[in-house]
Regions:
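Gly/Ala-rich beta-loop-alpha elbow adjacent to hydrolase catalytic centers
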Residues: 424-433
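N-terminal secretion-targeting helices of virulence/extracellular proteins
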Residues: 1-167, 396, 410
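Short, glycine/acidic-rich beta->alpha junctions
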Residues: 60, 71, 309, 343, ...
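Long, composition-driven intrinsically disordered regions
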Residues: 156-361, 373-385, 392, 409
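Short glycine-aromatic motifs
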Residues: 103-107, 293-296, 360, 496-500
């Protein structure tokens, strides 16, 4: 039977997520019973025909329980994958209905056909809507087929897994798999026993620390194990490169006449030094006097194999697992862990306090290779000084930001909590964020504000997968960056995008002056807390 538009309009992953929880609880009970059966068999000391028969029965029971545990484990992961797919479909349906809201002369019939009401819209708009509907239905068919295939394999006995209770994470992958969605990662982690989790954090922190969908406390613990190891390795690499650099430099310096060549190890030395600076700064920020700062969570620690790429990190001020409001700050050009994270965390501290520290966490997210900026020729920057002129970096960065946000949402959803997630992006960071929000899963991000934006890709707020009316922007009067990217594919400055609301700005302020403006900080805090930023609490307090 064909899947239709009228059916997928009502698709929602909530029932599948509930099924994952039910299956997880069943797996844990089955594993307890399997352990008890194995223990009972091991306790038998007698012999004889009756005892032999009993042991045979216990052995058969063990095999049966092992098989059931393996099958339930497969159902957990299959259902989590399907939940991700249904969420994709729900998002695509949202994009279709948002398109209709943007072009109200168009409508979608129960049969999925595009209808025209009122004045005749452009042909390109009708074609675009038809394509969106087609993609939504195609994704629904794909999800249904994939899930049915995995379910039939279990039902028909074609699914085979011979793991026993003696195996690590019986019936489940021992390590997270490449390509998992945050929903799948969360389901896998939720199905593991506490002993299995502790073993993974201890023995494989590199597989856990950056896994979107896991609790922040887990990621923080794993990354804090990794950080000193990565720093030590970076220092050793720098020492080795420095020795090679010095050796060649002695030869160059010894040339008595003629032009002296450039040291061939210069770039490698500078890159290795930047790597050490990144990790040293991060270690300083998340620790104090050799002790961990427990109100900071190290949620991302990505150390590229090659040193020509900067370390990526995300640090939360506050506990994202307990916070009902989680804001993510996305910086613009020139920001690296070594040069930008410290200032971002200072701002995050203030934003959290203004929004209500008891229920708020603020993340400083440097999860992409921010362009170094125009004319940056100093020796402390990776990347090209022309990267900021195109959207290529933003296109590459957007999926990582989406996964990060989705992971926070999913980890809260596992606790039965719908968090209020917001994005606060500056300069090129708004281009990254705007690109991400074009494709983010529906329901994840509740509001976003862009300040000092060269352009955030959309021409109408309906194009971002954020509730309409919850997109904001601030533009200082002497900011020369605002709107400068429109001709380069960045899109118009957000203040010119229908559906975007303006918040406080400074008519005399420059590009990077926003957070020092108390009124802007107040508006950002209200957005973070899910309040209306048009209500000026500073002025109201002054009038009391």
């Amino acid at each position: 039977m064909a899947i239709t538009w009228s059916e997928i309009r009502h698709w929602d992953p909530i029932d599948l997520n509930t099924a994952v929880e039910d299956l997880t609880n069943s797996r844990k009970k089955l594993m307890e019973e399997a352990d008890e059966a194995a223990s009972a068999k091991g306790r038998v000391q007698s012999s004889g025909a009756a005892v032999t028969a009993m042991l045979t029965s216990l052995g058969s029971l063990n095999e049966l329980l092992d098989a059931i545990v393996n099958e339930v484990s497969e159902l957990i992961m299959a259902t989590a994958e399907a939940a991700t797919g249904v969420w994709d479909v729900k998002t695509k349906v949202f994009e279709c209905t948002s398109f209709v809201e943007q072009y109200p002369d168009l409508s979608i019939g129960e049969d999925g056909q595009v209808r025209v009401t009122g004045s005749e819209p452009r042909l390109s708009e009708r074609i675009r809507l038809k394509e969106l509907i087609k993609k939504a239905i195609e994704r629904a068919v794909e999800v249904d087929n994939d899930y049915s295939k995995r379910l039939r394999a279990v039902a028909n006995g074609r699914y085979v897994c011979k793991e026993t209770a003696a195996s690590d994470s019986q019936g489940l992958p021992d390590l997270p798999q490449k390509g998992w969605s945050p929903t799948e990662a969360a389901a896998w982690w939720g199905a593991l026993t506490e002993a299995e989790r502790r073993k993974l954090i201890k023995n494989h922190p590199e597989a856990i620390g950056n896994l979107d969908g896991l609790p922040g406390s887990v990621r923080d613990e794993a990354n804090r194990i990794l950080l000193p190891r990565k720093l030590e390795a970076a220092k050793k690499h720098l020492k080795d490169v420095e020795e090679e650099f010095d050796s060649e430099q002695k030869i160059i310096d010894g040339i008595n006449s003629g032009p002296k060549g450039r040291n061939s190890h210069t770039e490698a030395f500078l890159e290795a030094r930047r790597r050490v600076k990144d990790l040293t700064k991060l270690n300083e920020l998340v620790s104090a006097g050799g002790k961990s700062r427990h109100h900071y969570q190290l949620l991302t620690l990505e150390v590229p194999e090659r040193c020509d790429k900067d370390v990526k990190a995300a640090v939360a001020v506050g506990d994202i697992d307990k916070a009902t409001n989680v804001a993510t700050m996305v910086p613009g050009i020139g920001n690296t862990v070594r040069k930008g994270m410290g200032g971002m965390l200072d701002t995050a501290e203030e934003l959290r306090a203004k929004a209500g520290a008891d229920k708020t966490a603020v993340v400083a997210w440097i999860g992409y290779d921010a362009p170094p900026g125009a004319g940056w020729t100093d020796t402390d920057s990776n990347g090209s000084d022309t990267d900021y002129t195109t959207t290529e970096v933003a296109d590459k960065a957007a999926p990582a930001l989406n996964r990060f946000q989705e992971g926070i949402y999913v980890s809260h959803d596992k606790q039965g909590v719908d968090p209020h997630l917001t994005v606060h992006a500056h300069s090129y960071g708004s281009t990254v964020s705007g690109t991400a929000l074009l494709n983010t899963k529906v329901g994840v991000v509740d509001a976003a504000q862009f300040h000092g934006s060269p352009g955030a890709r959309a021409t109408n707020a309906h194009q971002w997968n954020v509730p309409y009316g919850h997109m904001y922007t601030a533009e200082n009067g002497k900011d020369k960056v605002v709107g400068m990217g429109e001709l380069g594919g960045f899109g118009p400055e957000p203040s010119k995008v229908p559906g975007v609301q303006k918040i406080s700005s400074d008519p005399h302020g420059k590009h990077s002056d926003h957070w020092s403006n108390p009124e802007f900080m107040e508006d950002a805090a209200q957005i973070t807390a899910g309040k209306d930023p048009s209500f000026d609490s500073i002025d109201n307090m002054a009038r009391r």
